[in-house]
């Protein structure tokens, strides 16, 4: 393999500056069962993966059970294809008395082409609850 004609694996996996150095909350590979007849991955599958990532982040912060109460914003920038490795990056946007809002960005590493592309972004809100499913306060100084 010539260095002039072939890209190295490290070159192909170079992350864009927006995600370089960040660790995804979850990373999954889109499979055929996740797609529609046209071969694109269902938007609902992407939404559910984003929800899992956001809930994991909220739970780690609150150290308590959380439930999804809303999606305030959701944008689909590009399709996800079968075989893409999708990374979900989370960032805490707001913390209220009982709620946590998490910004979630999804990036696909393309199986074909070997490049990263931002595919979705959204704001998900979670509420902390007790065993009886009642909202509970998030302790300060988390």
Region locations from a protein language model:
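HotDog/MaoC-like acyl-thioester-processing domains
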Residues: 3-7, 13-16, 20-26, 81-82, ...
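Short, ordered coil/turn segments that flank beta-strands lining enzyme active or ligand-binding pockets
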Residues: 33, 37, 131-132
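Hydrophobic beta-strand-centered segment that forms part of the acyl-chain substrate-binding groove
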Residues: 41, 52-89, 93-95, 99-101, ...
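Short, well-ordered turn and helix-capping elements at secondary-structure junctions
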Residues: 32-34, 71-78, 108-110
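Phosphate-binding glycine-rich loops and adjacent basic patches that engage nucleotide phosphates
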Residues: 6-20, 46-52, 65-67
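A conserved, well-ordered hydrophobic junction motif at loop->secondary-structure transitions
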Residues: 35-48
């Amino acid at each position: 393999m010539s260095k002039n004609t072939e890209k190295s694996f490290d070159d192909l996996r170079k992350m864009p500056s927006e995600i370089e150095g960040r660790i995804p909350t979850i990373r999954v590979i889109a499979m055929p069962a996740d797609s529609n007849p046209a071969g694109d991955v269902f938007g609902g599958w992407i939404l559910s993966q984003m929800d899992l990532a956001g809930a994991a982040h909220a739970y780690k912060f609150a150290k308590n059970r959380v439930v999804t109460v809303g999606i305030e914003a959701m944008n689909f920038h590009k399709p996800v294809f079968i075989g893409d490795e999708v990374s979900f990056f989370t960032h805490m946007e707001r913390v209220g008395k009982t709620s946590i809002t998490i910004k979630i960005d999804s990036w696909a590493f393309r199986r074909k082409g070997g490049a990263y592309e931002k595919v979705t972004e959204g704001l998900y809100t979670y509420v902390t609850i007790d065993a009886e499913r009642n909202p509970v306060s998030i302790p300060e100084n988390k």
